[in-house]
């Protein structure tokens, strides 16, 4: 019977087998797939994974059928391992496509191939059944309470994820819901009803017509800049792609240290702690100060994330950039793999940020499809490139790349039977454009992944059903608030079109390698320019320019601008009407060569095109770049250029507002082309007129004059030289000027004036103003400026919603902002703090933030989920605090006279203090905060998923990418699997061959215990594990099924000398050198013997031999330890802890000093051992490169926050707990009665135990403990380990009589005992410290030696305990009372416990090992054959030494 980990590993091992061909049907039992992993291949994994899930699409009940069906919530699920591993049903056959007139028996292909829950459950071992997962005795559950944290090894992880995913599978759940409501029908009626049920759900979700029939359903992958798993639904009129991409709110997707470049050079950079979340990328000066970022990047505005070439290494760059509309931000990682992982994570999150909502919905009308081309991008899949007309307004061609691992030919057949033509790649670019001209398009493509240029989505899917008359999309565009696209300012330039294209292309984001490779392949197939290159292979602007030859549409890389009037690439059908006032209808070419014939009610000129977001305002074209920077069609541009040179016809035509087919003015035309055209934009001097008009004046102005520019109402054009034309232009734009009577409200800034230029003038056109309006504008601007300054210094308060001011009547709230101001302020707030478009501003206050004793003046914002702050007056303080971590907001007095204070209590953080100039403002802020806290607290955990599920999804995600990359030999785009949370932690990619891990350590029981936990998890991964340590731990280690090898040394002697000296000192070195010189030789020899045959070596650095053994064996080498051993400025070396904090320079110096002194003491013996036993040359500190060795710290990040100066290969994984309490432990009845009596008496329970330390006077220590317990009035559970070693008396017999308030025990598992007591006292060992804090216990630490002093300081710095420097009755009793009664310490310890319980250090360690395995191997290989240059004599003999050793190996190998 397979274990859960084996079940998972077999599936992972199947992934790289791409060369096998999978048949569509299987003759054997589908459950046999679990027993024969080598029969699987990537096809079965990917296809079944794709067909397994479309969860979350139809989670709302259908109101039309009136059934209350329980469907899965929108929480995230992953591709079920069980589903992906199940072979197709033996009866499943390839689906037969059907036309729209014939009703198929079963159009849902994925349903017919989806394994049911029962069949998958039968394939599971009995131990993995859902029943077994819930089995926990009520007694044990009641004992552990909230502090329970079971051991989550890979086996348990696989069990939980498997069951949850089976239950949450879309098809299983939807079928189950259907069976619940419609069960009992005959088979034919049953299938018909099921198809109708799915159709109804699809119509509501994709906004289709009520009578539209579902024809077929296929699993598919959409290839954009990421690879997205989803489903393709073909109906009678549409082709719909649906995929579920839920998000985990406020979750850290990836974090680590990066160097941020300054001045575009990595030579001048600052190292930051960087955190990637759903919609933002933030960097912090310190990993502990996570509420005050140094900067935040809004990913909804990011264009791309890509690797960039380093100055030193182009093949494996360690740098990457985040491309923004106006700049690029450069970062440098510590390794190429780390940079690659950051880029993959950023690409996924940028895509999610651009997508509308948590689902990818693309609805393509079949009538819009211009061409279907079957291409060969992947050798193992069918790829279909679909060219579609975007809308009847732009007639631009979009391209969608769909990849099918099955049913590719069936999809083509189904589409052709529904009237879609297939070119087979024979269409030229010109033929594609001609095909567009003959298309009768009445609908627009609806794509949730495309944005406005301002970062806001089109709301395509608001209504349940869309309109099919071609107007619905326009309504949706105009109903939402219009945003001015960026980079739309027309510019007069003398450059040739091809020169502008080259410059523009050079500024576009550079394509990744895998895209450039695909691009080159496609370019070779094209006759002309690479016009048929898919849009994901080139920038959106470049693709649109080449494919449509001048589809002049505003765009921002892959983002889409708001609906605006643009020239189509080919004339539409005659009679088409514009959908919005002031928008040009596509004209038709005439024999006279004129283009752009206008229709009634449409202001137009032959050479103008209206600006986005401003109805009726036109801008010229010609050789001037269009709204998105793309050139006009060549024929139109040449014609308009010729007209401007002639100077007559265009001007006349534009002045009258209409043109004849020949381009002349229509007789009798007036300035107002129709009653519906505002402002008479077709009148004399209208914007866009040629000759001496607005733009024409730039060419016709006298020599030596420079056209002026003016700003008015956010519209920007080059002002004419002719005053009359200028006045006419001002009159034309007057109705669109902000101000009284204009109809456009004046923007009211909430003192965020720094962003006005960005939001008000980017990408807009400017027109001149008349003197009266200019005077009014200046006065209004002065008044607005004075108002802002007054608000800035008076500490004003503003509310941004009536529903948040219940304590006042709507008419009485003097702080309520206007509707326009609410909109503008929300936009600026969302942009500044990068919190997403769903975050809404509630209130804002001017106040001081006190941080580090220094007041900083700025503005505090309260939003739906955050309280934020930004500073004024040239400072850069930024604060972002989620409301879910705010425990309370309380009033306080201010530091300055007359000021009022507000204190925010934060979970696991220091209080944040605000100071207000007025008590009323402070009170208002308190009310708003507390009210919002009451609103969100019931929903804090609504979107939180299981950490196990979150982790395994990312593992599967990386496995898909790595497998495809390995077999297809191409650089794959990042993969987003349906239902994935996009965690980018390094995946659990199990090595193809099982390995022997040797774990080498010395010391006490606490030093060995973490390695047992790691060894158990590695065994469940399928590897062999060996622990090499002292002989007294042999039975304990072998009891867990782990191999044991002995190394020399007596732990008791080691601890005695360390206790005697306490810390690392000169006397310690002198005694150690005299007593342990012989022991070091034995340790080195025994360690070498214990590591023979190992494939990977993980060593505690205190063992001293591991790095040399790994070099001799040429195997990957890792270090793992419980205390700081790597150089950093954040903490001192654990053996050299000062009495007071000495700063970063001193901390770093302690590591340098320790490394040199430690190596000086053992270097002679080590080098002799290397030469004699290992046959290696002498070495030194520089050659060993210890700082480059991958390091695993088995400590929680809550206790040891990662320093910013730690490189990427140093990981703080979390504690490696060995939960022995869950291993059939039965507590002593005497202990249970003692604990119950203490509870009944209302006394606090305290555990006191100092581990296996050695003390000189055990009786005196016991006496001090007993007297302190009695004085503090607590009950004590005493574990007297200090008498177990080197004592004269029996350790089980007490030295002094113990009172009834004290119960002595021998051994009791910490994971069983600690959740049931109130505080703990111990020696400060890493394992005991972690166990106590995990249970949320206030901790008292009395250190004796080594790292215990370090952890005593850390616990005290965290506020979760007390560092007891002297163990006497007075100080110990006081500490006991503080730990059991101080609410501040109790609350802080509970917060740290919650964080530790959310971690899984063992799984994180295995992830780090797998990820850094190649890196560790490269370090060892680089050292091979090295000889220090300081010893030239030995250097000459190095090669001979190596040859002799190799020859000896060959002789022994062949038994010669």
Swiss-Prot record:
Residues 556-567 have a biased composition (Polar residues). The keyword Acetylation does not apply. It is a peripheral membrane protein. It catalyses: a sterol + UDP-alpha-D-glucose = a sterol 3-beta-D-glucoside + UDP + H(+); ergosterol + UDP-alpha-D-glucose = ergosteryl 3-beta-D-glucoside + UDP + H(+). Keywords: Cytoplasm, Glycosyltransferase, Lipid biosynthesis, Lipid metabolism, Membrane, Repeat, Steroid biosynthesis, Steroid metabolism, Sterol biosynthesis, Sterol metabolism, Transferase. Residues 137-146, 496-508 have a biased composition (Basic and acidic residues). Disulfide bonds: none annotated. UDP-alpha-D-glucose binds at residues 1004-1005, 1007, 1279, 1307, 1310, 1323, 1326-1328, 1347-1348. Residues 60-70 have a biased composition (Acidic residues). Residues 677-696 have a biased composition (Gly residues). Pfam families: EryCIII-like_C, Glyco_transf_28, GRAM, PH. Residues 71-104, 576-606, 647-676, 719-735 have a biased composition (Low complexity). Residues 60-113, 128-156, 462-512, 524-776 are annotated as: Disordered. GO terms for cellular component: cytoplasm; membrane. InterPro entries: ATG26_PH_GRAM1, ATG26_PH_GRAM2, EryCIII-like_C, Glycosyltransferase_28, GlycoTrans_28_N, GRAM, PH-like_dom_sf, PH_domain. Residues 251-351 form the PH domain. Its EC number is 2.4.1.-, 2.4.1.173. It is an enzyme of class 2 (transferase). Residues 200-247, 827-893 form the GRAM domain. Sterol glycosyltransferase responsible for the glycosylation of ergosterol to form ergosterol-glucoside. This is Sterol 3-beta-glucosyltransferase. It comes from Yarrowia lipolytica (strain CLIB 122 / E 150). The lineage of its organism: Eukaryota, Fungi, Dikarya, Ascomycota, Saccharomycotina.
């Amino acid at each position: 019977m397979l274990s859960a980990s084996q079940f998972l590993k077999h599936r992972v091992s199947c992934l790289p087998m791409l060369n096998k061909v999978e048949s569509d049907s299987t003759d054997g039992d589908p459950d046999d797939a679990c027993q024969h992993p080598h029969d699987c291949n990537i096809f079965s994994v990917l296809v079944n994974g794709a067909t397994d899930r479309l969860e979350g699409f139809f989670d709302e009940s259908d109101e039309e059928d009136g059934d209350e069906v329980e469907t899965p919530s929108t929480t995230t699920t992953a591709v079920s391992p069980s589903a992906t591993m199940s072979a197709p049903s033996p009866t499943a056959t390839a689906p037969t496509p059907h036309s729209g007139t014939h009703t198929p028996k079963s159009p849902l292909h994925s349903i017919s191939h989806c394994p049911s829950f029962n069949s998958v459950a039968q394939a599971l071992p009995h131990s993995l059944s859902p029943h077994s997962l819930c089995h926990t005795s009520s007694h044990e559950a009641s004992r552990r309470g909230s502090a329970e944290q079971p051991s989550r090894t890979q086996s348990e992880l696989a069990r939980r994820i498997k069951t949850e995913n089976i239950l949450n599978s879309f098809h299983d759940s939807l079928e189950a819901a259907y069976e619940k409501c419609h069960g009992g029908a005959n088979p034919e009626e049953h299938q018909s009803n099921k198809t109708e049920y799915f159709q109804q759900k699809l119509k509501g979700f994709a906004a289709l017509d009520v009578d539209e029939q579902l024809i077929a359903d296929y699993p598919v992958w959409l290839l954009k800049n990421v690879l997205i798993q989803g489903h393709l639904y073909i109906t009678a009129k549409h082709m719909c792609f649906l995929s579920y991409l839920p998000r985990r709110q406020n979750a850290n997707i990836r974090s680590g240290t990066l160097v941020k470049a300054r001045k575009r050079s990595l030579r001048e950079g600052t190292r930051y702690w960087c955190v990637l979340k759903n919609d933002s990328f933030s960097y912090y000066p310190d990993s502990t100060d996570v509420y005050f970022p140094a900067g935040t990047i809004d990913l909804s505005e990011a264009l791309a994330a890509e690797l960039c070439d380093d100055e030193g290494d182009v093949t494996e760059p360690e740098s990457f950039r985040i491309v923004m509309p106006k700049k690029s931000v450069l970062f440098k990682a510590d390794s190429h793999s780390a940079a690659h992982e950051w880029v993959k994570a950023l690409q996924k999150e940028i895509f999610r940020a651009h997508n509308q909502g948590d689902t990818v919905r693309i609805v393509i009308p079949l009538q819009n499809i211009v061409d279907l081309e079957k291409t060969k991008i992947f050798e193992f899949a069918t790829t279909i490139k679909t060219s579609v007309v975007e809308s009847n307004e732009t007639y631009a061609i979009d391209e969608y790349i769909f990849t099918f691992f099955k049913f590719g030919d069936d999809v083509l057949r189904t589409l052709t039977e529904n009237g879609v033509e297939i070119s087979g790649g024979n269409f030229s670019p010109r033929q594609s454009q001609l095909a567009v001209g003959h298309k009768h398009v009445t609908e627009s493509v609806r794509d949730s992944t495309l944005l406005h240029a301002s970062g806001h989505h089109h709301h395509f899917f608001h209504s349940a059903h869309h309109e099919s008359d071609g107007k619905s999309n326009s309504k949706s565009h105009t109903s939402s608030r219009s945003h001015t696209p960026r980079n739309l300012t027309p510019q007069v330039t003398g450059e040739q079109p091809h020169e502008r294209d080259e410059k523009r292309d050079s500024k576009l984001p550079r394509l990744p390698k895998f895209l450039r490779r695909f691009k080159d392949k496609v370019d070779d197939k094209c006759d002309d320019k690479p016009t048929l290159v898919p849009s994901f292979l080139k920038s959106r602007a470049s693709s649109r320019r080449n494919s449509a030859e001048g589809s002049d549409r505003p765009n921002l890389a892959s983002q889409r601008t708001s609906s605006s009037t643009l020239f189509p690439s080919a004339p539409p059908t005659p009679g088409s009407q514009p959908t919005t006032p002031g928008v040009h209808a596509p004209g038709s070419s005439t024999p006279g060569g004129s283009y752009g014939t206008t229709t009634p009610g449409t202001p137009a000129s032959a050479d103008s095109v209206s600006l986005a977001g401003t109805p009726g305002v036109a801008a010229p074209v010609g050789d001037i770049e269009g709204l998105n920077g793309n050139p006009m069609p060549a024929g139109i541009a040449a014609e308009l250029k010729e007209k401007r040179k002639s100077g007559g016809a265009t001007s006349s035509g534009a002045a009258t507002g209409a043109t004849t087919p020949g381009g002349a003015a229509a007789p009798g035309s007036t300035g107002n082309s129709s009653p519906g055209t505002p402002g008479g934009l077709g009148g004399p001097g209208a914007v866009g007129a040629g000759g001496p008009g607005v733009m024409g004046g730039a060419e016709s102005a006298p020599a030596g004059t420079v056209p002026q520019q003016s700003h008015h109402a956010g519209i920007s054009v080059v002002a004419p030289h002719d005053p009359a034309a200028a006045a006419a232009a001002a009159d034309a734009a007057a109705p669109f000027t902000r101000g009284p009577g204009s109809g456009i409200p004046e923007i009211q800034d909430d003192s965020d004036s720094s962003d006005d230029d960005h939001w008000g003038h980017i990408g807009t056109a400017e027109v001149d103003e008349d003197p009266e309006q200019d005077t009014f504008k200046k006065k209004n601007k002065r008044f607005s400026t004075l108002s802002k300054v007054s608000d800035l210094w008076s500490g004003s308060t503003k509310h941004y919603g009536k529903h948040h001011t219940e304590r006042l009547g709507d008419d009485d709230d003097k702080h309520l902002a206007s509707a326009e101001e609410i909109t503008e302020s929300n936009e600026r707030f969302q942009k500044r703090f990068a919190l997403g478009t769903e975050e809404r501003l509630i209130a804002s206050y001017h106040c001081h933030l006190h941080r580090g004793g220094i007041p900083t003046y700025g503005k505090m914002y309260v939003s739906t989920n955050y309280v934020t702050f930004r500073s004024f007056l040239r400072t850069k303080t930024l604060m972002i605090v989620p409301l879910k971590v705010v425990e309370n907001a309380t009033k306080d007095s201010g530091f300055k006279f007359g000021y009022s204070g507000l204190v925010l209590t934060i979970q696991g953080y220091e209080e944040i203090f605000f100071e207000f100039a007025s008590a009323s403002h402070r009170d208002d802020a308190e009310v708003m905060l507390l009210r919002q806290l009451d609103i969100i607290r019931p929903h804090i955990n609504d979107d939180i998923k299981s950490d196990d599920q979150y982790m395994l999804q990312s593992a599967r995600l990386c496995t898909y990418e790595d497998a495809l990359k390995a077999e297809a030999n191409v650089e794959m785009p990042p993969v987003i699997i349906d239902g994935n949370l996009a965690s980018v932690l390094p995946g659990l990619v199990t090595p193809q061959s099982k390995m022997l891990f040797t774990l080498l350590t010395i010391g006490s029981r606490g030093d060995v215990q973490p390695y047992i936990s790691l060894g158990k998890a590695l065994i469940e991964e399928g590897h062999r594990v060996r622990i090499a340590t002292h002989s007294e731990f042999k039975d304990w280690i072998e009891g867990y099924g782990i191999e044991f090898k002995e190394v020399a040394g007596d732990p008791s002697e080691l601890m005695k000398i360390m206790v005697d000296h306490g810390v690392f000192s000169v006397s310690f070195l002198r005694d150690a050198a005299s007593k342990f010189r012989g022991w070091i030789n034995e340790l080195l020899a025994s360690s070498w013997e214990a590591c023979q045959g190992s494939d990977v070596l993980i060593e505690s650095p205190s063992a001293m031999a591991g790095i040399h053994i790994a070099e001799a064996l040429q195997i990957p080498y890792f270090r793992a330890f419980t205390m700081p051993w790597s150089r950093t400025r954040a903490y001192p070396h654990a053996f050299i802890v000062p009495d007071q904090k000495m700063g970063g320079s001193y901390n770093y110096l302690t590591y340098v000093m320790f490394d040199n002194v430690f190596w000086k003491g053992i270097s002679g013996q080590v080098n002799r051992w290397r030469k004699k036993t290992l046959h290696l040359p002498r070495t030194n500190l520089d050659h060993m490169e210890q700082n480059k060795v991958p390091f695993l710290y088995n400590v929680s990040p809550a206790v040891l926050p990662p320093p910013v100066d730690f490189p990427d290969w140093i990981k703080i994984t979390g504690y490696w707990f060995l939960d022995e309490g869950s291993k059939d432990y039965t507590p002593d009845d005497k202990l249970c009665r003692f604990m119950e009596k203490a509870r009944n008496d209302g006394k606090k329970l305290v555990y006191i135990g100092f581990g296996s330390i050695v003390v000189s006077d055990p009786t005196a220590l016991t006496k001090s403990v007993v007297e302190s317990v009695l004085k503090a009035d607590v009950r004590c559970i005493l574990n007297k380990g200090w008498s177990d070693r080197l004592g004269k008396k029996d350790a089980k017999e007490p030295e002094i009589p113990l009172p009834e308030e004290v119960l002595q025990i021998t051994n009791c598992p910490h994971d069983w005992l600690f959740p049931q007591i109130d505080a703990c006292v111990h020696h400060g060992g890493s394992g005991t410290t972690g166990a106590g804090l995990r249970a949320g216990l206030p901790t008292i630490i009395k250190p004796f030696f080594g790292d215990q002093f370090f952890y005593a300081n850390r616990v005290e710095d965290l506020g979760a305990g007390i560092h007891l420097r002297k163990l006497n009755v007075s100080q110990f009793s006081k500490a006991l009372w503080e730990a059991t009664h101080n609410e501040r310490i109790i609350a802080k310890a509970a917060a740290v416990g919650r964080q530790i319980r959310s971690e899984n250090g063992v799984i994180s360690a295995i992830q780090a090992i797998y990820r850094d395995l190649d890196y560790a191997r490269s370090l060892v290989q680089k050292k091979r054959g090295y000889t220090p240059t300081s010893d030239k004599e030995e250097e000459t003999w190095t090669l001979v030494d190596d040859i002799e050793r190799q020859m000896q190996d060959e002789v022994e190998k062949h038994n010669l």
